[in-house]
Amino acid sequence: MGKKDKNKKGGQDSAAAPQPQQQQKQQQQRQQQPQQLQQPQQLQQPQQLQQPQQQQQQQPHQQQQQSSRQQPSTSSGGSRASGFQQGGQQQKSQDAEGWTAQKKQGKQQVQGWTKQGQQGGHQQGRQGQDGGYQQRPPGQQQGGHQQGRQGQEGGYQQRPPGQQQGGHQQGRQGQEGGYQQRPSGQQQGGHQQGRQGQEGGYQQRPPGQQQGGHQQGRQGQEGGYQQRPSGQQQGGHQQGRQGQEGGYQQRPPGQQQGGHQQGRQGQEGGYQQRPPGQQQGGHEQGRQGQEGGYQQRPSGQQQGGHQQGRQGQEGGYQQRPSGQQQGGHQQGRQGQEGGYQQRPSGQQQGGHQQGRQGQEGGYQQRPPGQQPNQTQSQGQYQSRGPPQQQQAAPLPLPPQPAGSIKRGTIGKPGQVGINYLDLDLSKMPSVAYHYDVKIMPERPKKFYRQAFEQFRVDQLGGAVLAYDGKASCYSVDKLPLNSQNPEVTVTDRNGRTLRYTIEIKETGDSTIDLKSLTTYMNDRIFDKPMRAMQCVEVVLASPCHNKAIRVGRSFFKMSDPNNRHELDDGYEALVGLYQAFMLGDRPFLNVDISHKSFPISMPMIEYLERFSLKAKINNTTNLDYSRRFLEPFLRGINVVYTPPQSFQSAPRVYRVNGLSRAPASSETFEHDGKKVTIASYFHSRNYPLKFPQLHCLNVGSSIKSILLPIELCSIEEGQALNRKDGATQVANMIKYAATSTNVRKRKIMNLLQYFQHNLDPTISRFGIRIANDFIVVSTRVLSPPQVEYHSKRFTMVKNGSWRMDGMKFLEPKPKAHKCAVLYCDPRSGRKMNYTQLNDFGNLIISQGKAVNISLDSDVTYRPFTDDERSLDTIFADLKRSQHDLAIVIIPQFRISYDTIKQKAELQHGILTQCIKQFTVERKCNNQTIGNILLKINSKLNGINHKIKDDPRLPMMKNTMYIGADVTHPSPDQREIPSVVGVAASHDPYGASYNMQYRLQRGALEEIEDMFSITLEHLRVYKEYRNAYPDHIIYYRDGVSDGQFPKIKNEELRCIKQACDKVGCKPKICCVIVVKRHHTRFFPSGDVTTSNKFNNVDPGTVVDRTIVHPNEMQFFMVSHQAIQGTAKPTRYNVIENTGNLDIDLLQQLTYNLCHMFPRCNRSVSYPAPAYLAHLVAARGRVYLTGTNRFLDLKKEYAKRTIVPEFMKKNPMYFV
């Protein structure tokens, strides 16, 4: 029997010494290793991984082991760049052009993630503070010692598949864990050890065979990803410990015989799992700490033991599914606030498997393996069994298990509340039934729900159903559909009777597998169970329909007439509850508040007096002068027409199409063969109009007019209009909706209390329970970059902003630019003060010199009149005199911004910078001038600033960043096309961009002409850089979740085809930027003077628990919200051919949020996507003045930007 080892000071773990026969064999293998490493042909034959060969090797007798002590690493400090250290030496080598890890020892070289072998000997690596990528390629390691240590800011440490015989493997993960994995392979009779430090990066030991050697890896403070592949372990010790902020610890499938497997996860983990396998002869124990939430042990066979579970204070959910448990001991303890601890089905016979998860446990997993006849404690182990055959070549890496997407690890750890409620689906039936509902007539649809409810009670025996209000309903019981009386009668609020015919029938595939929601979570299949999700979504909306007005997924509660919040022009703001069924690591209900403007219900006469005329109506009031502003409000609105009592008819609802051409006293129509005026007609019916001089409302069609007197109409209550709000409405709505996170949460909780989901019979019948408070998840706060200006001067970013403080722009253009200031000199009305105008010009010149912009001090001042032709004359003169810039001061009325941009950029090719006259007259201060100069320098093809070089991001200098966005017309502009905007960088810093825009069919999401757009961007990149990019990072904005496949199959295909056409093969990473969602972060604490809205810090990342378990996805708040609750941006990575590490991608994305040229603040999403939005907005400016677009190609040709202007000033659109 092996002796117990004593631990050394300094945190070293014990290891059993090999037998003399083993030591002799190991010494021979160490002598052979240099020769084996000098076989470059192995690098060229990755196929060997797919063609394993068998070789006979005898396992040493392991019952005669002697204790030995593990030697500490002799390297001190750490290397700054990622590299490889072997044989006690440090070797630093990394390709500076990104995503390529290179290793040289002797004549062996590894490039571009190629893994190769190592046989025997001693392998040691230590990575320093900012380490990036440390890799030890696969090979055969027989009877040696492998050790790796990663330093403070870890990154990526990897030991690929090989054969390791008779060693020691141990894994310890520190405070901010991340990801610890042991994939498949054969490990016999040894000890494997790895230690990951505080914020661990990525440490990996892929599959191989280990017999009687020693392998040790230690990762330092900010590591992140530690992996040890699975294998066959006979008589060894495998141990993993994860520290405070756990993350993800995994041991995949393999055969483990006669050893000890132990895992401990620390404070902030979240998900601990041991998948199905065969474990013989032992003890399995799991403990989850304070903030667990969900502890599960699925079905399996456990022989010889005890199963025990304890749930703590705020436990949440603890489950042990059916299985056979005979003997053995399985124990799980869940702490104060739940989490998720799972041990899937398997066979456990004897053996000892232990896992402990700390306060907020992350993710600890031990996949299926075999552990027979094993009993030992930490530091002591035995092996029994006959020697086994070994394979000469390592087995191929197994496919990554579903749901094991690598998550980020770097950053300062923390916690935050998320507006997600846990859903308990444990009592949900296994199936539901889907039925098609057909209701005739099709209009009015707003009474469908009332008619269906009557049908449910009368014809379906009051069956509990979930109806979506349109064409589907769901039930957990089969419905009796044979005998139906399809006709029902309903009465509206005005007493009008409506008859509907309802038909219900089963769909083609009526049965819905509701258990697929559980299967999705447990088995981690990659396809969402969409039908089951749709069913649950309809069920969860059931309690809201009768209490609120539904708009999309939001339910708006009617306002109190005595306490309404009025916006402008007759609108009020209503607050509604948004809810959506979500699948992350478990089912959630996403809840948030929504704000929407609704027309205020009031008589039309009151509306005219308060908002349109803003005066009392009398006998002389005329609507001709107000018609231009009144009709846009009236068109499409519903009014209730209340006939006079003498008509003896019920009120009716009509939709307004506009105003009549003439007042009621003059407008005529045919009645009894005569033409009569509307006023005389009502007078003949004993109702003389009070205001016959007012126009009537036209509620008929274009063919047949129906005219109603305004004084008999009122605006219908609760209308959700699908129209664009005016500028004043938007400004007032933002002020009203901008609240702190504390106030926002209080509003959400009040609405949840109002709707009472858990008391709804439909939700109860489907076996769903909803939690009462937000979930709490782990976060990481990324470090902000340093911003670099001219002469290598740097400034720190604090709370999402920074100051220049005397610094100069990084790269201004040295030429003295000729500048002109244009101002409006109307023929009549107020004129600009020339002194203010001159002061403004002098400030532009003086402050421009201070930041290194060279503007000619001889400024030209030119007035223009109300006539647009005067602008044409001035622009033509400036073009002839070779002026570089025209600063145009825009009056509040008369000449518009759109007109100026169209003339300057489409006709004359003049660079313009517009500023409002009000700003020049009232706000002309240093800050305003500084912000204008930021735009001017970028437009003149200068670079304001860049991010300080980061050794972890070497690929930045040969990367083209592409941002794309598609803006669509508002719903009331159906004939206006969509505008595509694509911006692409062409400099080493990601600071200078060129643009392309296109017109395409309205509401078309994918970009049709991406091939030619990419070709043009590649041409410009080659022109500036004399080479094509090695990497393309594509940030795509404005895409809904359902459009992801189209983007990947169409837009990315076009990008690749364009690259093929010019003969380059860049690695492509495509990131979808999603802003339209309702996920919000709610930190604890109260409002402070420095954080008056109580938002999270810029750089806060969430990439666990609430994200899709099978996709590379993360949320990030990259900005400091000026007002209201900060909205995180969601990023979905749908293509990553270069295998860009998630930590690097998150830091790179955060850095790019500091590269927006318009301001010295970080913005809410990366600069490429933001600039693409500006491109699309500029394309929409070019459409102003045209209402019909019959031929988009011809219309686009009319709006071609002057080519030489675009070449000289590629960032003119900023």
UniProtKB/Swiss-Prot annotation:
Disulfide bonds: none
GO biological process: cellular response to virus; cellularization; defense response to virus; dosage compensation by hyperactivation of X chromosome; miRNA-mediated post-transcriptional gene silencing; negative regulation of viral genome replication; piRNA processing; piRNA-mediated gene silencing by mRNA destabilization
TM annotation in the entry: none
Signal peptide: none
Subcellular location: Nucleus; Cytoplasm, Cytoplasmic ribonucleoprotein granule
Lineage: superkingdom: Eukaryota
Family annotation (SUPFAM superfamilies): PAZ domain, Ribonuclease H-like
Chain spans, region Disordered: 1-412
Mutation effect (S854T): In strain: 128, 130, 138, 140, 141, 186, 187 and 196
Residues engaged in binding a divalent metal cation: D965, D1037, H1173
Occurrences of domain Piwi (ranges): 885-1186
GO cellular component terms, semicolon-separated: cytoplasm; cytoplasmic ribonucleoprotein granule; cytosol; neuronal ribonucleoprotein granule; nucleus; RISC complex; RISC-loading complex
Required co-factors: Mg(2+); Mn(2+)
Effect of D866E: In strain: 128, 130, 141, 186 and 187
Region feature (Interaction with guide RNA): 681-686, 1075-1076, 1119-1127, 1156-1178
Keyword terms of this UniProt record: Cytoplasm, Host-virus interaction, Magnesium, Manganese, Metal-binding, Nucleus, RNA-binding, RNA-mediated gene silencing
Biased composition (Low complexity): 18-93, 107-117, 270-282, 362-394
A GO MF label: RNA endonuclease activity
Major location (coarse): nucleus
Protein family membership: Belongs to the argonaute family. Ago subfamily.
UniProt free text on domains: PAZ domain provides a major contribution for nucleic acid recognition. PAZ binds oligonucleotides of different lengths and has a strong preference for single-stranded nucleic acids (ssRNA or SSDNA) or RNA duplexes with single-stranded 3' overhangs. Can bind the characteristic two-base 3' overhangs of siRNAs, indicating that it may contribute to the specific and productive incorporation of siRNAs and miRNAs into the RNAi pathway.
Protein name stated in the entry: Protein argonaute-2
Organism: Drosophila melanogaster (Fruit fly)
